[in-house]
């Protein structure tokens, strides 16, 4: 009985002292990668990587189209690089810092063509780097599997990537001529014949081929602007090639005819705006000599170089 009473008094004494201090026990520290950076999936979309524009249309050899929609990564040092063919190149810093860097090193722009062969893919208009935008050139080489093999920065804000793929191992896999439409192949044949007949100079030959590659959608016309990236917006009108422009023009013409017919059916009067050509407009303001001088100033120099 005395033992039970002593035990009860001991418990009562401990209870009167209150709970143990919070710091009395040991604290277990769990380290986890932070999610405060730009790749935090819980951040709003506006806080993530924001491209300056839409990528160019997928173009080039048909057997490479299967790479579209896929991405390949490579970790070098503390950075993870990701190459998405026909889309973009990105860089992500692998660190526990709250402000880890993630950025776009370039968006799909055009092919690099040397000796009538596809040599590389240019990714431009990446994130700002000092007074310019980052850009990358991706070289395609033969390999057993699809993989991003190497990344370097040969000059400030300009990156060089090597992508290995079995899709380019055949010696003719990157030739430009077989990828062209029959009409463009005939144009190329004529250019070759004109060069052989000395009707054009080598400089004119190169210019004509560049125009041909631009019409095929492999190269961009100098000064051509890309559709900008708009949140929730469309991806542009798809006027990357001459054929697409012609198709869009035909569709617009049909729409105009349909609307005109609709107005006529309902007896609604309409007038067709008069058109004034550029030459007529100049003729009203400038003498003939000035028109000729203006034409020479605006001449791109192609004819003078190829004859």
UniProtKB/Swiss-Prot annotation:
A single GO BP: carbohydrate phosphorylation
Keywords: Disulfide bond, Glycoprotein, Golgi apparatus, Secreted, Signal
InterPro entries membership: DMAP1-bd, Gtb1-like, Man6P_isomerase_rcpt-bd_dom_sf, MRH_dom, OS9-like_dom
Gene Ontology cellular component terms for the protein in this record: extracellular region; Golgi apparatus
Glycosylated residues in this chain: 88, 115
Residues covered by the DMAP1-binding domain: 176-279
Effect of mutating residue 142 to S: Does not affect homodimerization
Modifications made to the protein after synthesis: Cys-245 mediates the formation of the interchain disulfide bond for formation of the homodimer. Cys-142, Cys-157 and Cys-169 are involved in intramolecular disulfide bonds formation.
SUPFAM superfamilies: Mannose 6-phosphate receptor domain (SSF50911)
Tissue spec: Widely expressed. Highly expressed in the liver, intestine, brain, thymus, testis and ovary.
Matching SMART domains: DMAP_binding
A molecular-function term among this protein's GO annotations: protein homodimerization activity
Paired cysteines (S-S): 71-84, 129-157, 142-169
MRH domain mapped to chain residues: 69-171
Compartments in which it is found: Secreted; Golgi apparatus
Segment forming the signal sequence: 1-24
Function: Non-catalytic subunit of the N-acetylglucosamine-1-phosphotransferase complex, an enzyme that catalyzes the formation of mannose 6-phosphate (M6P) markers on high mannose type oligosaccharides in the Golgi apparatus. Binds and presents the high mannose glycans of the acceptor to the catalytic alpha and beta subunits (GNPTAB). Enhances the rate of N-acetylglucosamine-1-phosphate transfer to the oligosaccharides of acid hydrolase acceptors.
Quaternary structure (record): Homodimer; disulfide-linked. Hexamer of two alpha (GNPTAB), two beta (GNPTAB) and two gamma (GNPTG) subunits; disulfide-linked. The alpha and/or the beta subunits of the enzyme constitute the catalytic subunits.
Protein name according to UniProt: N-acetylglucosamine-1-phosphotransferase subunit gamma
Gene source species: Mus musculus
Source taxonomy: Eukaryota, Metazoa, Chordata, Craniata, Vertebrata
């Amino acid at each position: 009985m005395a033992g039970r009473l002593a035990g009860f008094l001991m418990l009562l004494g401990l209870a009167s002292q209150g709970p143990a201090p919070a710091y009395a026990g040991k604290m277990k520290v769990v380290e986890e990668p932070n999610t405060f950076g730009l790749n935090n999936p819980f951040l709003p979309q506006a806080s993530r990587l924001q491209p300056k524009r839409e990528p160019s249309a997928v173009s080039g050899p048909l057997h490479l189209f299967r790479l579209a929609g896929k991405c390949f990564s490579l970790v070098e040092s503390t950075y993870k690089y990701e190459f998405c063919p026909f889309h973009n190149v990105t860089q992500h810093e692998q660190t526990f810092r709250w402000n880890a860097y993630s950025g776009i090193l370039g968006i799909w722009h055009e092919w690099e063509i040397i000796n009538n062969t596809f040599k590389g893919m240019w990714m431009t208009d990446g994130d700002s780097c000092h007074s310019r935008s980052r850009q990358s050139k991706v070289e395609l080489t033969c390999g057993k599997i699809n993989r991003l093999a190497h990344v370097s920065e040969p000059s400030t804000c300009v990156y060089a990537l090597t992508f290995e793929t079995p899709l380019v191992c055949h010696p003719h896999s990157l030739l430009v001529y077989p990828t062209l439409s029959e009409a463009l192949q005939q144009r190329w044949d004529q250019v070759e014949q004109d060069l052989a007949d000395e009707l054009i100079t080598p400089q004119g030959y190169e210019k004509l081929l560049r125009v041909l590659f631009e019409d095929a959608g492999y190269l961009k016309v100098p000064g051509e602007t890309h559709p900008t990236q708009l949140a929730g917006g469309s991806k542009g009108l798809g006027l990357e090639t001459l054929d697409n422009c012609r198709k869009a023009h035909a569709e617009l013409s049909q729409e105009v005819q349909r609307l005109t017919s609709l107005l006529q059916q309902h007896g609604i009067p309409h007038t067709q705006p008069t058109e004034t050509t550029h030459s007529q407009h100049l003729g009203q303001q400038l003498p003939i000599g000035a028109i000729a001088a203006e034409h020479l100033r605006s001449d791109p120099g192609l004819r003078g170089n190829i004859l």
